Amino acid sequence: HDVLPWNKIEAFHMDEYIGLNPSSPQSFAYFIEQTLLSKRNIMSKNFIDGSVDVNTMIENYTKLLTAKPLSMVGMGIGENGHIAFNDPPVADFNDKVWMKEVELEEKCRIQQVNDGCFPSLDLVPKTALTLTIPTLMSAKSLICVVPGKLKAEAIRNTLYGDISEKCPASILRKHPNAKLFIDTDAAMYI
């Protein structure tokens, strides 16, 4: 029995590869649609389209985000500590924009191959669109689910390392209503 009023939920997603449209099987929009949203009666779905002009997408998505503040963000943490596509080299806790174009760190791209999203590194896009850290942190509630031993070091750094852009997920410790759910493998270093 569902306890969520799905018909009142307006869904957004956090990041997308530049060059992929929402119907591409490697896109996050496709994954979210197939695994969750298509199974529920959602009020509206707002996907990032990585195949359109980047500046237009940023402008349009920013308008949506500013008109409809985020209530809850469901997220994971990458092997390098990224949240959304805010990898350590491009993460900025004080970004002044809601969304930006980023170059993906190789470790992040390798994770996409290891996760089975792409058959080889040369097929993983090098750039993406991402909601910025201040945008994610603006949500009233953050739910973070992180399984697997490959994420264990990132979990340790998130919980016990310095709060810095070297581990973008470390900023979650400053959110007043962030919840972290991990499995035994992800907890192996804590």
Regions inferred by a protein language model and the residue ranges of each:
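Ligand-binding beta-strand-loop-alpha-helix segment within the catalytic cores
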Residues: 4-74
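ATP/nucleoside-binding phosphotransfer catalytic cores, i.e., glycine-rich phosphate-binding loops
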Residues: 131-134, 138-190
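Short, flexible loop segments at the rims of nucleotide/cofactor-binding pockets, characterized by
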Residues: 49-53, 119-125, 158-159
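Glycine-rich beta-alpha junction loops
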Residues: 18, 77-81, 149-150, 185-186
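A glycine-rich beta-strand to alpha-helix segment
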Residues: 64-92
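A glycine- and small-aliphatic-rich helix-loop capping segment at beta-alpha/alpha-beta transitions
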Residues: 1-5, 28-34, 88-98, 161-163
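Short beta-strand segments
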Residues: 13, 48, 74-77, 144-147, ...
